[in-house]
């Protein structure tokens, strides 16, 4: 911009006439003196010089093009320095004021710069320059005594005429004021290009007056009700200055001066002030740690010191967004009403019912996003605003709107009044207490924001904002230094239930964003402001919950504007709830950073065509496309080169990123990684897990662990009773409930004390039951002692485990793919279902249904006598167990026994299955549903036992449980088994041949234990103390081998019970956004729960009398329940359903979308072939070898299937996509997580 001042239209247009009534007495000839001063200051000769200089420039300078030589000349010349227009006014009109009693410090000059380079200044110095320009323009001419007046008077006092007359008549030099005498004389002569000498404040009289030495004398005598002139007014434009207070303004106002300028001149001024022309730049600014200069210019008013406060570190937080719209209440009074909120997803307030709707993904119109970007590009952006209250923020926002010409000066009061209206929320009317949402304006006035002594209750409304009254800005500045006033008694209240419930869903340390949008008719065009506070503060009566506010967005405008304010408010709210955008908003230094973040958001947005959607199925591709866009967004964020995007700006952020990179570079401690040394994996397990041994007991001091003990006890006792009862049936009571309970207790206690992963639950499982049945059949057919053979199997079992651990063979579990696991799980489920109906059919054969006979009394009695003679039945025989009738043949042909057994079996199954479904239903609160669903099996057993107990005249076979600490059949065996034989010597060849069944048992234990440990140790579960594959395997197998000496069972890690145990000890974050999946906060990794569960299971022998009341038909129902529920989550079972579906109804899963249907059916056919082969082996005398056939499916998958299917098809058909299940989705629970048998 040229340094030539613009020509005003006329003196009458540019200056205000003095008020004659203010002229003090004793000042005759005052108008003539004033006229002389005007002619001397800005005479006609001066304007002619200005016009000649402007004419010499003419249009040729405006129309010419600049080259590199001009740019170089610009850098080397004084034109490179920014001069405001006021610097070209007469010297006496642009003096800089200095309060009395202070001395102008010499200007500190930066170091010399090499020739030809643009001097670089520090950011703080640039702020100092801007503050100096704001407070008063400076002159770059050398001051001289002849041309520099002694004082500058901005406002005339009553005795100004007398002072001026004295200055005219007296030839003596002007009197020195006290602060001038203290200044060294050499300072005025040094540095010819320094700032002008300090201006002298008018003291109302001569220097030698009565109060000439007073330092606090104001510039003018303030009239009653007015405040004195303050430098803060320099922030306003000239047309807003209180000119009515001045008798003789020396500087024309902006409006009157702008009327005399041509359009080209105005454009040139705007270009110089606001644009950044390449090649013609100002001084380079070196960023330092003092903070952003923009925050000084836009965020807050300049204080008394030119230095800005250091910028507070902006660490991104989680956000809570609230959308408030300006609406009318039932009394037709305007108020801010909450219409939507965002924690992660959008929740809208339903207009009719005033309640919150369901959370959903916000759908935005593309036009609203474009309008939002346009308003942000041209609106007011205040970053790092240093305010603590809503009125203070509102004042700053309104001032910035006036300065940026978004609103007129006369609209200031209306906009401010609108910002301070009452805020209402949907939960307010539900509270039966004192309303908390009091108007911020009135409440702020009552609590001391305006300390006026008048009777006005609302200064914002009743008092003018400019002139005539004390300005609120001074009060806001004073308020910063005072502690916040305490609210009156009766206003504060405790948090309501609604607030507490909502606060649980908001993440900890979250900061809020308040969005205010609405229509106001007093504005002629929309106005916008985006505010980021320096520090998050709680604004009273604004949000529905006490969350500190960091961001505010304001959009007001007339209804005639072609703009949907509601949609723009939803757009900025959705942007602030987006993770990437709100991080960019925290780290933004200027407006361009926000615009760049909006563009990045638009790049990943999906636009739907304006076509009618008939059903939700048509929108499936949208979700898939959105996931692809998000994946691409994440990849681009990882691939950004240094210097691109939002880089860390502080040392703390850089150090944090370096730490994250260092942690990511460290190789994960894979427990299955081989060391190459004998027992190397076992040693690593011990070193990894045992240092946390003491913490495993300290971490159990939590109420959640006690609840987990009760739940897991019933979860472990039910299978022990079920499998024990079935084992007693299979082995003729050689091993039954008593032995299984003792095995579970002893091995469970030992494993919880010494194991590496105490979250595993040791128990009996379906595959081991199948093996025990097969081995018992083998021994019985070959006339071998079953229990003695188990002792030698246990011996070889321990040797096999030692060899496997020494060779670090646990890594072989990685080769067991989903192909093998699903065949294994499906086989065990089929066996469970088959055995249930086989037992039920057997009951119907033993107790057939009786036909209806004419004379059924005698025949029935005869039949009754022939079948019950040895049983000696009593009226209470229905409640006796088979153990009490040892050695007595069980009754045969009992009436109604088969029907009652069917009812008990079906009832147990359906109750347990229904309660499992009820857990994820929508009835009752979630906590009640989970308790009922988790205890579904014990509840089903209890209900059916009560049903059976109530029917006394019908016989049912009961569970065989001994009294006290005893084996199931004391007449057949004892607690210690002789390895050489009980009744006869055990064959030596069988001692050696027991190695083969030992290997088969080891395969089963290895697969179940290691796969269960893999599932528990998934990264998604966020376990911190690690696992130990080698140590756990050695402990479980060794304990099983030793227990065989006592006739007890070997156990394995039970998959379903272990996953249930881990889920019960998982602490989920309560701060879960509505509609979002729960996140794991921590897992209570400790040993106490498993230890207590094992002890309680062992003590269950004390309740033998209660266990003897359980009918076997009830256990068959639990057996059926385990078989059916194990099918969930098996893709093989789900793909069988696709055979009966047309392709258009196939689910939208990976193995359907990426693999052709015929190829998918071919893979399924191969699995069916392997399953049929295993079933055939199980049905023959070679059923003992079924684990060997099962393990052959591993090389089949690795060698044969890879030649039939492509690598991509195998990844889709044999991928392990199961993830930990923690949320409550209908039909989904822990059974869907694992393709393993129960």
Curated annotation (Swiss-Prot):
Give the catalytic activity. Answer: hydrogencarbonate(in) + chloride(out) = hydrogencarbonate(out) + chloride(in)
What residue spans carry the region label Membrane (anion exchange)? 705-1238
The residues that carry sugar chains are 856, 865, 879
Where this protein primarily resides, as one coarse class? membrane
- Gly residues compositional bias, start-end: 205-215
Renumbered residue ranges of the record's region Disordered: 1-238, 277-315, 445-466, 858-892
Modification sites for Phosphoserine: 132, 144, 170, 172, 239, 439
Q: Where is the signal peptide?
A: none
Q: Where is the lipid attached (S-palmitoyl cysteine)?
A: 1170
Q: Record's Gene Ontology CC terms?
A: apical plasma membrane; basolateral plasma membrane
Q: Which residues carry this modification: N6-methyllysine?
A: 270
Query: Acidic residues bias: where?
Result: 120-133
Residue ranges crossing the lipid bilayer per the database entry? 705-728, 734-771, 791-813, 823-844, 898-915, 931-951, 985-1007, 1033-1054, 1088-1133, 1160-1196
Membrane topology classification: Multi-pass membrane protein
* Tissue expression as described in the entry: Expressed in the cochlea (at protein level).
Keywords attached to this entry: Anion exchange, Antiport, Cell membrane, Glycoprotein, Ion transport, Lipoprotein, Membrane, Methylation, Palmitate, Phosphoprotein, Transmembrane, Transmembrane helix, Transport
Compartments where located: Apical cell membrane; Basolateral cell membrane
One GO MF annotation is: chloride:bicarbonate antiporter activity
Query: Could you list which ranges are Cytoplasmic topological domains?
Result: 1-704, 916-930
Q: Tell me the residues on which Phosphothreonine occurs.
A: 253
Extracellular-side stretches of the chain, per the record, are: 845-897
Q: Where is there biased composition of kind Polar residues?
A: 141-154, 858-869
Q: In which residue ranges is the amino acid composition biased (Basic and acidic residues)?
A: 37-49, 58-75
Assigned protein family: Belongs to the anion exchanger (TC 2.A.31) family.
Q: What does this protein do?
A: Sodium-independent anion exchanger which mediates the electroneutral exchange of chloride for bicarbonate ions across the cell membrane. Plays an important role in osteoclast differentiation and function. Regulates bone resorption and calpain-dependent actin cytoskeleton organization in osteoclasts via anion exchange-dependent control of pH. Essential for intracellular pH regulation in CD8(+) T-cells upon CD3 stimulation, modulating CD8(+) T-cell response.
What protein does this entry describe? Anion exchange protein 2
Source organism of this protein record: Cavia porcellus (Guinea pig)
Organism lineage reads as: Eukaryota, Metazoa, Chordata, Craniata, Vertebrata
Gene of this entry: SLC4A2
